[in-house]
Amino acid sequence: MSKTVELARHLDTLHINNMYKNDFYWTWDKTDDEIDAIFTVADALRDLRERNKSTRIFDSGLGISLFRDNSTRTRFSFASACNLLGLEEQVLDEKKSQIAHGETVRETANMVSFMADVIGIRDDMYIGQGHTYQKTFMDALEEGYRDGILEQRPTLVNLQCDVDHPTQCMADMLHVIHYFGGVENLKGKKVAMTLSLIHI
């Protein structure tokens, strides 16, 4: 039996029904089962990739990225994730869009989301603004979907805001779990995560 099949069986034991069509704003909003599921799916994708098996679940579609701050690792990770799943990344550059001419968040959010399955937003420059902007963007999409403007509502992945950086936290934690050979081996250890450094 392949590792992916074992991981899929493990997923069946988890309570994760609320994850579907649910945005990922903050790490601490997820249940233990949901965090476990994210790590399990990441390991399954890694296993498939290492065995040169396709991981595409989309035949078409867009992953929209909006970076309101500089990024290297997260930017390329999001683009790679879109590609891995079969989505084409489309970068929303605010300086080259109608946002620069005063277009509202509501108009922009709905316009760029017509064919989008996921939207990744990084807005971490100012305390009190990043998460608020992400919520405003997604509230506009919820309204657009409810009013029939959008055929589907894309899911948000927080690529860092002023409150949390869930993708970095999750990637770092999974690395630590692999390094120690399982989450159970972290019991009794002190882990400090500071910026991009982990100390154990």
Label each residue range with its predicted role.
Residues 44-48, 143, 178:
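Conserved helix-loop functional segments at active or binding sites
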Residues 2-76:
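Positively charged, low-complexity intrinsically disordered leader regions
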